[in-house]
Amino acid sequence: MKLVAVADTHGEHCRLTIPDGDVFLHAGDLTERGTLEQLADVAEWMRALPHRHKLVIAGNHDFAFERKPKEARALFHGLTYLEDEEVTLDGVRFYGSPWQPWFHSWAFNVRRGPAIDAVWRKIPAGVDVLITHGPPMGLGDKVWDGERVGCEDLLRHLPRVGAKAHFFGHIHEDRGEWQHGVTRVVNCTTSEGELPATVVEL
């Protein structure tokens, strides 16, 4: 299965040339301000892509998914929006979650420690592909000043989950791929459309 992944398009999705594949996935920050109008534009663009399956989660900029969830989800008809949910496509299990450790006053914030650990405990063991908006600690999480800002609790859950691949964005400065146990860990940020989509063969 060929996966084509992006994150952090921030409304600049039309700048991207999207490769062919079986599954297109967006790991959040579809928009800049998270309005319903901005989400509608992204949804229309995604529906026009030729991929058989299209998955999306929200990011910290995508406020409407948190403030007006019913209206936001309705815009993504014909696409698969995941919010602490699982879907199986062609026998492959995908799980998506938008939450991140508390970050200023953005959307989908959860306090570090027990609160966010409870979020990650919902991820079923044995999913094949995990999609979160933010990174685990120490992998694809280094910001411009060298600080690591990923989630320690998410990192701790990766071995239990045992996914073949974990996609995320959020940190524009640390795009790349790493191996953590059995899991291929991928920061697929496009940094507002400046970087290409990431392609992974599962």
Across the structure, where does each feature detected by a protein language model lie?
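Catalytic metal-binding/acid-base residues of hydrolase active sites
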Residues: 10, 30-31, 60-62, 86, ...
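Charged helix-capping and loop-helix junction motifs
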Residues: 39-43, 71-79, 111-116, 145-155
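Active-site-proximal segments of metal-dependent phosphoesterases and phosphodiesterases across multiple
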Residues: 31, 36, 103-104, 126-164
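Core catalytic region of metal-dependent phosphoesterases/phosphodiesterases
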Residues: 6-89, 188
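Binuclear metal-dependent phosphoesterase catalytic core
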Residues: 86-90, 153-161, 165, 172-202
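Proline-centered loop/turn at the N-terminus of a beta-strand
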Residues: 2, 53-55, 80, 93, ...
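Binuclear metal-dependent hydrolase catalytic cores centered on His/Asp/Glu-rich metal-binding motifs
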Residues: 92-129, 147-153
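Active-site-proximal beta-strand elements of phosphoester/diester hydrolases
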Residues: 1-10, 27, 91-100, 128-133, ...
